[in-house]
């Protein structure tokens, strides 16, 4: 997980890599993620900005998230959830991630 603050982003923590502008103190409400560059189609991966992913196998963070941001090139095979400043850092190592099929996976979050 990461916070939209200068120490963890670039000089514009309220603007994500796809150009989306956020309200920093409401970051946890968006359900956005940043992915490592190797996972983005632009660099040969399988995800694109705007794609939805289903995250499962976490402790309280399972759900549907939208790809909106990317990470420094030093990170590989990683997805970070965007959280508001003040949210205590957490980490998952065995989470499962798949690209969402919106026709089926929307049922997952509404039931």
Over which residues does each language-model region extend?
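Solvent-exposed, well-ordered loop and adjacent helix/strand elements within mature globular domains
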Residues: 1-111
């Amino acid at each position: 997980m990461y916070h939209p603050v200068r120490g963890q982003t670039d000089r514009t923590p309220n603007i994500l890599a796809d150009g989306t502008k956020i309200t920093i103190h409401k970051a946890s409400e968006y359900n956005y993620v940043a992915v490592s560059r190797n996972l983005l189609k632009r660099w040969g991966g399988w995800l694109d900005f705007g794609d939805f992913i289903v995250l499962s196998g976490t402790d309280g963070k399972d759900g549907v998230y939208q790809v909106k941001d990317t990470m420094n090139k030093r990170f590989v095979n990683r997805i970070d959830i965007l959280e508001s400043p003040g949210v205590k850092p957490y980490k998952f190592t065995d989470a499962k991630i798949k690209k969402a099929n919106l026709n089926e996976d929307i049922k997952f979050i509404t039931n």
